[in-house]
């Protein structure tokens, strides 16, 4: 079914609306998105929770969390809506059941070195969109070949992570055009560089997210981006890959990964603004999560 693209929206809003699948009673559980979150350790249980709940609130039907055994009980207790696997290894075997994957939130940096290539190779074999964030970016910095040349990979570095990754891949400090340069050097993966202005590039094109955000910088906001982004990536690639859909013609200028990154950036920025209007300095990521429904309806009125 062709997505509804509402009139009166900005060009960026229309771009994202064109890949969002319409809701209808004919769909079965799981068809709107099954997302996997690979992350969670003894110290960090909140990060995978926020990523997972962002995916659910954005519209995913099912979300699996694959975490260290020490994190599983806490994450299970946070929400009964999440399917929690108390082992990272389960992520590899469950990939055929998923539509998109997030690697990194709260993962920690002591994962066995040989396991990461196995995970990313299987993701490539399945053709799954993969969002790499937080500790996942640490492993990509150590081994850029994990994502090199994979067009369905989306990296979401903050300023510090971008600096480290750029130096590791290009061997010099970041320059003014660091985002498209990094994307090209990694074989045209998509990079969503988070900052005062979110910059998105696949090395061919560049988008700037102009949506106003929040001055509050509480922990967990990046996890909200990565979780919602995984679902947007599934939707966008599905729209792009479906023959005959109008969205495929409309989105020819920008690749599906870039459109997905734009959607997630806009959504979380609007959530931050709405939450800050209510909570000011007390704003937490949980407050932003509570604004997903309102922000989505305001930005992407497709239903």
Swiss-Prot record:
It comes from the Eukaryota. Its cofactor is Mg(2+). This is ATP-dependent (S)-NAD(P)H-hydrate dehydratase. ATP binds at residues 194-198, 213-222. It catalyses: (6S)-NADHX + ATP = ADP + phosphate + NADH + H(+); (6S)-NADPHX + ATP = ADP + phosphate + NADPH + H(+). Its EC number is 4.2.1.93. It is an enzyme of class 4 (lyase). PANTHER family: ATP-DEPENDENT (S)-NAD(P)H-HYDRATE DEHYDRATASE, ATP-DEPENDENT (S)-NAD(P)H-HYDRATE DEHYDRATASE FAMILY MEMBER. Catalyzes the dehydration of the S-form of NAD(P)HX at the expense of ATP, which is converted to ADP. Together with NAD(P)HX epimerase, which catalyzes the epimerization of the S- and R-forms, the enzyme allows the repair of both epimers of NAD(P)HX, a damaged form of NAD(P)H that is a result of enzymatic or heat-dependent hydration. It comes from Ixodes scapularis (Black-legged tick). GO terms for molecular function: ATP binding; ATP-dependent NAD(P)H-hydrate dehydratase activity. InterPro entries: Carbohydrate_kinase_pred_CS, CARKD, Ribokinase-like. The keyword NAD applies. One of its GO terms (biological process) is nicotinamide nucleotide metabolic process.
């Amino acid at each position: 079914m062709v997505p509804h693209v509402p009139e009166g929206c900005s060009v960026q809003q229309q771009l994202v609306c064109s890949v969002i699948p319409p809701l209808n009673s004919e769909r079965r559980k799981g068809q709107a998105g099954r997302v996997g979150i690979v992350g969670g350790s003894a110290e960090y249980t909140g990060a995978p929770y926020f990523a997972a709940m962002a995916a659910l609130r954005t519209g995913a039907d099912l979300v699996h969390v694959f975490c260290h055994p020490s994190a599983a009980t806490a994450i299970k207790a946070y929400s009964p809506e999440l399917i929690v696997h108390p082992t990272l290894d389960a992520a590899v075997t469950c990939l055929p059941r998923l539509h998109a994957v997030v690697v990194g939130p709260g993962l920690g940096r002591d994962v066995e070195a040989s396991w990461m290539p196995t995970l990313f190779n299987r993701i490539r074999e399945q053709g799954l969109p993969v969002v790499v964030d937080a500790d996942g970016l640490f492993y990509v910095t150590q081994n850029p070949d994990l994502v090199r040349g994979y067009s369905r990979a989306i990296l979401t570095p903050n300023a510090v992570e971008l600096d480290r990754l750029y130096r590791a891949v290009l061997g010099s400090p970041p320059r003014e055009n660091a985002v498209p340069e990094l994307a090209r050097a990694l074989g045209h993966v998509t990079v969503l560089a988070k900052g005062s202005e979110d910059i998105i590039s696949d090395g061919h094109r560049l988008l700037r997210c102009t949506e106003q955000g929040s001055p509050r910088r509480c922990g967990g906001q990046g996890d909200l981006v990565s979780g919602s982004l995984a679902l947007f990536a599934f939707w966008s690639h599905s729209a792009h890959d479906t023959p005959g859909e109008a969205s495929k013609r409309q989105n020819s200028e920008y690749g599906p990964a870039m459109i997905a990154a734009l959607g997630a950036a806009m959504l979380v920025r609007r959530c931050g603004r709405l939450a800050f209007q209510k909570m000011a300095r007390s704003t937490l990521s949980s407050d932003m999560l509570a604004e997903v429904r309102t922000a989505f309806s305001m930005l992407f009125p497709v239903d």
